[in-house]
C-alpha cells in the first residue's frame, strides 16, 4: 500500500539502531564533523608497501583535507609528512607518485630531507638571524605511520592508540592471504563517484545487494554455503564475513582460469571479505585481492581508489592470467564493479536531494550472511566517534 506524506516522513516502529536519518549522507555540518572526529582521529589506509618499493619512492594523498606525502627513507623506513612547506605553506610534492632524494618547495627553494623531514637548505638564510627565526625548528610535520601485513596506515592524531590495537583481530582471517608471501599492486584505478563515502563502504557491508550482481547470482547465490556464513564483529567498527566456496564454474570464462596461481591460504573458488572502519575493504577471491579505500571530497562526492594485488613472484604468463582474473570482475569495465558504482550513484540522486528521509538496516538473520549486522556495527562506531545518533541528526 502506498503512503501519505505524513506516513512517509515518519520512521517505522523499529529499534533506533535499525534506521538512519538520511541527513548523515548529505548534511554539510555532518560531513565537516566526520573529517574532524573520524578521519582526523583513526588509522587511515594510504597505500601498499609495494607501491613505494625503492628508497625515496613516494605517494601523495589527502586525509581529512590534509595533504600528505608517504615516502620510503634511506633507512628503508616508511614515513609520512604533511606536504606543505614550513615557511609559507606551499605544497611541496606535486605528483601523485615518484622518487625524490630531497623535497624542494618551488616558491623559495627551501629543501627538506626525504628521510627525516629536516630543513636542509634555504637561500640566503642569514637574513633570518635578526628576527630570531630558528630554521632548525622548520622541519616538516611528521605524521604517525605504521605498517601491518604490507598495508600502510597513517594517523593525524598523535595521541591515538597503536595500529595493532586499532585493528585488533579484525584481519585474523586475512593473515594467511596477506602475509604468507610477498604481494604487490599490479592494478590501480580510481574514480570520483557522485555519492557519499559511506554509501560506497556500505556496498562491502551489505551482502543482501548481491542479488543485483549478475556474476554473483550465477556463482554465489546458488550455493547453500553462501547463506550459512556468519558475520564476525570486532572492536572499533570492524567486521568480516566467513569464507565460502563459490561455484565459479557457472560463470562463462572461469573454466579457462589457472588454479595454479591461487593465493596462499585460499581455495581457487574461495571468497573472503573484511571491512576496517572507516573506509577500507579487502576482498580476496581465489587468485586476486581487491582493496578499496576512499577520500571524501564533499557530502555528495567521493574519490574511491581500487588496488589489485597478486604475488610478486608471478611469471609473465601468471601475471597476465591474474590481471585477466581481476579485471574481468573488478576492473572498471568488469561485470561487478560497474554495477556497484551505478547503484551508489542512483542512491545519491534521491538521498542527496533530501527526498527520502530514512534508510533501514532491519535485516535480522541471526548474524548470518545477509543480516544487516555489519552495517549496524559500522554505524554504532560512527555514533561513538561522532557523539550523536545516526537515526536523529537534529
UniProtKB/Swiss-Prot annotation:
Induction of expression: Part of the abs operon that is induced during growth with 2-aminobenzenesulfonate (ABS) as carbon source.
Pfam families per UniProt: Rieske, Ring_hydroxyl_A
Reaction equations catalysed: 2-aminobenzenesulfonate + NADH + O2 + 2 H(+) = 2,3-dihydroxybenzenesulfonate + NH4(+) + NAD(+)
Cofactor: binding comment: Binds 1 [2Fe-2S] cluster per subunit. Binds 1 Fe cation per subunit.
Domain Rieske: 43-154
EC number: 1.14.12.14
Binding site for [2Fe-2S] cluster: 85, 87, 105, 108
Cofactor(s) for this UniProt protein: [2Fe-2S] cluster; Fe cation
Record entry for activity regulation: Inhibited by o-phenanthroline.
pH dependence: Optimum pH is 7.5.
InterPro entries: Rieske_2Fe-2S (IPR017941), Rieske_2Fe-2S_sf (IPR036922), Ring-hydroxy_dOase_2Fe2S_BS (IPR015881), Ring_hydroxy_dOase_asu_C_dom (IPR015879), Rng_hydr_dOase-A (IPR001663)
Temperature dependence comment: Optimum temperature is 35 degrees Celsius.
Keyword NAD set for record: yes
Listed Gene3D superfamilies: Naphthalene 1,2-dioxygenase Alpha Subunit, Chain A, domain 1, Rieske [2Fe-2S] iron-sulphur domain
CDD domains per the UniProt record, alphabetical: RHO_alpha_C, Rieske_RO_Alpha_N
GO molecular function: 2 iron, 2 sulfur cluster binding; 2-aminobenzenesulfonate 2,3-dioxygenase activity; iron ion binding
Entry keyword set: 2Fe-2S, Dioxygenase, Iron, Iron-sulfur, Metal-binding, NAD, Oxidoreductase, Plasmid
Task of the protein: Alpha subunit of the oxygenase component of the 2-aminobenzenesulfonate 2,3-dioxygenase system (deaminating) (ABSDOS). Can use 2-aminobenzenesulfonate (ABS), benzenesulfonate (BS), 4-toluenesulfonate (TS), 2-nitrobenzenesulfonate, 3- and 4-aminobenzenesulfonates, 4-chloro- and 4-hydroxybenzenesulfonates and pyridine-3-sulfonate as substrates. No desulfonation of ABS to aminocatechol or aminophenol detected.
Protein family membership: Belongs to the bacterial ring-hydroxylating dioxygenase alpha subunit family.
Protein's recorded name: 2-aminobenzenesulfonate 2,3-dioxygenase subunit alpha
Biological classification of the source: Bacteria, Pseudomonadati, Pseudomonadota, Betaproteobacteria, Burkholderiales
Gene from which this protein is expressed: absAa
Amino acid at each position: 500500500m502506498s503512503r501519505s506524506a505524513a506516513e512517509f516522513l515518519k520512521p517505522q516502529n523499529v529499534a533506533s539502531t535499525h534506521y538512519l536519518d538520511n541527513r548523515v549522507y548529505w548534511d554539510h555540518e555532518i560531513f565537516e564533523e566526520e573529517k574532524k572526529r573520524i578521519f582526523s582521529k583513526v588509522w587511515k589506509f594510504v597505500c601498499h608497501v609495494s607501491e613505494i618499493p625503492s628508497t625515496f619512492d613516494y605517494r601523495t594523498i589527502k586525509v581529512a583535507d590534509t595533504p600528505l606525502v608517504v615516502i620510503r627513507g634511506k633507512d628503508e623506513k616508511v614515513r609520512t609528512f604533511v606536504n606543505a612547506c614550513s615557511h609559507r605553506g606551499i605544497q611541496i610534492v606535486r605528483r601523485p607518485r615518484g622518487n625524490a632524494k630531497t623535497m624542494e618547495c618551488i616558491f623559495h627553494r627551501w629543501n627538506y630531507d626525504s628521510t627525516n623531514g629536516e630543513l636542509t637548505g634555504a637561500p640566503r638564510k642569514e637574513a633570518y638571524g635578526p628576527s630570531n627565526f630558528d630554521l632548525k625548528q622548520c622541519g616538516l610535520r611528521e605524521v604517525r605511520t605504521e605498517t601491518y601485513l604490507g598495508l600502510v596506515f597513517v594517523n593525524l592524531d598523535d595521541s591515538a592508540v597503536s595500529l595493532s590495537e586499532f585493528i585488533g583481530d579484525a584481519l585474523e582471517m586475512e593473515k594467511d592471504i596477506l602475509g604468507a608471501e610477498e604481494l604487490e599492486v599490479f592494478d590501480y584505478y580510481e574514480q570520483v563517484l557522485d555519492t557519499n563515502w559511506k554509501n560506497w563502504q556500505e556496498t562491502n557491508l551489505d551482502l543482501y545487494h548481491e542479488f543485483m550482481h549478475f556474476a554473483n547470482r550465477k556463482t554465489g547465490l546458488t550455493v547453500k554455503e553462501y547463506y550459512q556464513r556468519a558475520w564476525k564483529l570486532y572492536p572499533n567498527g570492524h567486521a568480516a564475513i566467513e569464507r565460502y566456496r563459490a561455484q565459479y564454474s557457472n560463470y562463462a570464462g572461469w573454466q579457462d582460469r589457472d588454479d595454479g596461481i591461487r593465493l596462499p591460504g585460499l581455495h581457487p573458488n574461495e571468497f573472503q571479505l573484511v571491512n576496517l572502519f572507516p573506509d577500507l575493504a579487502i576482498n580476496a577471491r581465489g587468485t586476486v585481492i581487491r582493496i578499496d579505500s576512499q577520500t571524501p571530497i564533499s557530502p555528495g562526492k567521493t574519490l574511491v581508489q581500487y588496488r589489485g594485488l597478486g604475488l610478486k613472484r608471478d611469471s609473465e604468463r601468471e601475471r597476465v592470467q591474474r590481471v585477466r582474473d581481476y579485471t574481468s570482475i573488478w576492473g572498471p569495465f568488469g561485470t561487478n564493479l560497474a554495477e556497484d558504482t551505478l547503484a551508489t550513484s542512483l542512491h545519491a540522486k534521491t538521498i542527496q536531494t533530501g527526498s527520502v528521509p530514512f534508510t533501514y538496516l532491519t535485516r535480522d538473520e541471526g548474524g548470518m550472511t545477509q543480516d544487516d549486522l555489519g552495517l549496524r556495527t559500522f554505524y554504532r562506531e560512527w555514533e561513538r566517534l561522532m557523539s550523536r545518533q545516526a537515526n536523529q541528526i537534529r
